[in-house]
From Swiss-Prot:
This is Ribose-phosphate pyrophosphokinase 4. It catalyses: D-ribose 5-phosphate + ATP = 5-phospho-alpha-D-ribose 1-diphosphate + AMP + H(+). One of its GO terms (molecular function) is ATP binding. It holds the Pfam family Pribosyltran_N. Its EC number is 2.7.6.1. GO terms for cellular component: cytoplasm; ribose phosphate diphosphokinase complex. Belongs to the ribose-phosphate pyrophosphokinase family. Transmembrane segments: none annotated. The gene is PRS4. It is found in: Cytoplasm. Pathway: Metabolic intermediate biosynthesis; 5-phospho-alpha-D-ribose 1-diphosphate biosynthesis; 5-phospho-alpha-D-ribose 1-diphosphate from D-ribose 5-phosphate (route I): step 1/1. Its main location: cytoplasm. One of its GO terms (biological process) is 5-phosphoribose 1-diphosphate biosynthetic process.
Length: 326
C-alpha cells in the first residue's frame, strides 16, 4: 500500500464531533480537513439537564470532539456538554477520543494563590480524563503548567505563527514596537520581538483586586511608535484600555492590541468602543462578534485542522509551533 492510499484510509477513519460552543470554528475545521461533522444532537431538558445523542456508529473510530471553553451560553454548560460527549463516545466503543479545546476553561485558576483556594484547572483536567478523554489539543494555555495536570498527552498549540504573519502583513511593521501589558507576558512578547527583530517594552501593573488595575508604569521608549500590545487573552479589557492610555500618554503613534482569546465579558465592548485603540485583533478560538470598526480577526482553524491530521496519522505536531498552515 503506497503512502497516499494509507493516508486516505487513515483520514476516512476520523470522526469529527462538535458541541454547541463554537459551531463556526468546527465547520471551518471540517471543511479544511474535508471531513463532514458527525451527527450530534445536544438538548436541554426543562430542568436544564443536558442530553446528548450521536447519530452514527463510532465503534473503533478515531474521534475528535471540538468544544471551546466559552460561547454564548454559560461556561459550565459547555464544560458539562463536553464531558457528556466524551462519555457518550467512550461507551460507543470509540478507539481514541481527542478533545479539541481551543480555549481551555478555568485556565486562570491554575495555582493556589491564597488560603483555601481551589486549583480548578486541575479539577477540569481530572474531569476530562475521568469522562474518557485520551488526548487534549488546546491553544495558548494561560499557564503552561496546566499540561502537567494531565496523565494523558496534551498538545498546547501556539497562535504565535499566525500572529507573526499578521504583524508582518497587516501592521506598520517597520515602525513597530512590541509591548507586554504585564510582567507575566514579558517572555511571550520578548520571543515575538526576537523573531521579528523588533524592540519591546513592558508595562508593570499594580492591582488592588482581580480585574481592576490601579497603576501602570511603562518600561521602554514608545515615542512615535506603532505599539503592538500582545497578550494571551482579553476579558474585561480594563488592562488593555489602561495600557493603551499609558502608551499614548508616552507619545505612541498608535496602539494595536493583539490577543489569542477574545473573551470580552461584561462591559468590555463599551470600553473598547470608547478607547484610544486603533485596532483590536483576536483569533477565533472563541466565538466573537465585536461589531466594532476597529475589530479584526485571525483565523486559526487551519492550525487545528492540521494538528488533527498530523495526530491521526502519527506525525509530529512540532512543525505547527513555528509555522502557520493556510
Amino acid at each position: 500500500m503506497n503512502s497516499e492510499s494509507r493516508e486516505d484510509m487513515a483520514i476516512n477513519s476520523i470522526k469529527l464531533l462538535a458541541g454547541n460552543s463554537h459551531p463556526d470554528l468546527a465547520e471551518q475545521i471540517s471543511k479544511k480537513l474535508g471531513i463532514p461533522l458527525s451527527k450530534v444532537g445536544v438538548y436541554q431538558y426543562s430542568n436544564k439537564e443536558t442530553s446528548v445523542t450521536i447519530g452514527e456508529s463510532l465503534r473503533d473510530e478515531d474521534v475528535y470532539i471540538i468544544q471551546t471553553g466559552i460561547g454564548e451560553q454559560e461556561i459550565n454548560d459547555f464544560l458539562m456538554e463536553l464531558l457528556i460527549l466524551i462519555h457518550a463516545c467512550k461507551i460507543a466503543s470509540a478507539r481514541k477520543i481527542t478533545t479539541v479545546i481551543p480555549n481551555f476553561p478555568y485556565a486562570r485558576q491554575d495555582k493556589k494563590d491564597k488560603s483555601r483556594a481551589p486549583i480548578t484547572a486541575k479539577l477540569v483536567a481530572n474531569l476530562l480524563q475521568t469522562a474518557g478523554a485520551d488526548h487534549v489539543i488546546t491553544m495558548d494555555l494561560h499557564a503552561s503548567q496546566i499540561q502537567g495536570f494531565f496523565h494523558i498527552p496534551v498538545d498546547n498549540l501556539y497562535a504565535e505563527p499566525s500572529v507573526l504573519n499578521y504583524i508582518r502583513t497587516k501592521t506598520d511593521f517597520d515602525n513597530a514596537i512590541l509591548v507586554s501589558p504585564d510582567a507575566g507576558g514579558a517572555k511571550r512578547v520578548a520571543a515575538l520581538a526576537d523573531k521579528l527583530d523588533l524592540n519591546f517594552a513592558l508595562i508593570h501593573k499594580e492591582r488592588q483586586k482581580a480585574n481592576e488595575v490601579s497603576k501602570m508604569v511603562l518600561v521602554g521608549d514608545v515615542t512615535n511608535k506603532s505599539c503592538l500590545l500582545v497578550d494571551d487573552m482579553a476579558d474585561t479589557c480594563g488592562t488593555l484600555v489602561k495600557a493603551c492610555d499609558t502608551l499614548m500618554e508616552h507619545g505612541a503613534k498608535e496602539v494595536i492590541a493583539i490577543v489569542t482569546h477574545g473573551i470580552f465579558s461584561g462591559s468590555a465592548r463599551e470600553k473598547l468602543r470608547n478607547s484610544r485603540l486603533s485596532r483590536i485583533v483576536c483569533t477565533n478560538t472563541v466565538p466573537v462578534d465585536l461589531d466594532l470598526p476597529i475589530a479584526d480577526q485571525i483565523d486559526i482553524s487551519p492550525t487545528f485542522a492540521e494538528a488533527i491530521r498530523r495526530l491521526h496519522n502519527g506525525e509530529s505536531v512540532s512543525y505547527l509551533f513555528t509555522h502557520a498552515p493556510v
